[in-house]
Amino acid sequence: VSVRRERIDVSIDSDRGVFMISVAAELAHMHPQTLRIYEARGLIQPKRSPKNTRLYSQRDVERLRRIQQLTAEGLNLAGVERVLTLERRLRELEGDADATG
């Protein structure tokens, strides 16, 4: 008996909100209340479902892990916010440099 297996390529949109808060918290190894605090501080902006449920993307989970890493290194949330802003700005500048050659 031969079994034919086909490879299916699945591209996942890393910005699509798919994880409810409990799942995102588990993936990031955090308590759901921590995610709510980070949202209130503006560190994370999850998408919302039509019923206003928070939906976190893979990129959001990665950002939560980065926040956790920075706080473990001793930064407070104001410091974390500053570092994330500077990292975003650096990516923008690198993108501009790549575009202009």
Predicted regions and their residues:
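Arg/Lys-rich, alpha-helical DNA-contact motif
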Residues: 1-20, 26, 40, 45-46, ...
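Short coil turns linking two alpha-helices in DNA-binding domains
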Residues: 31-34
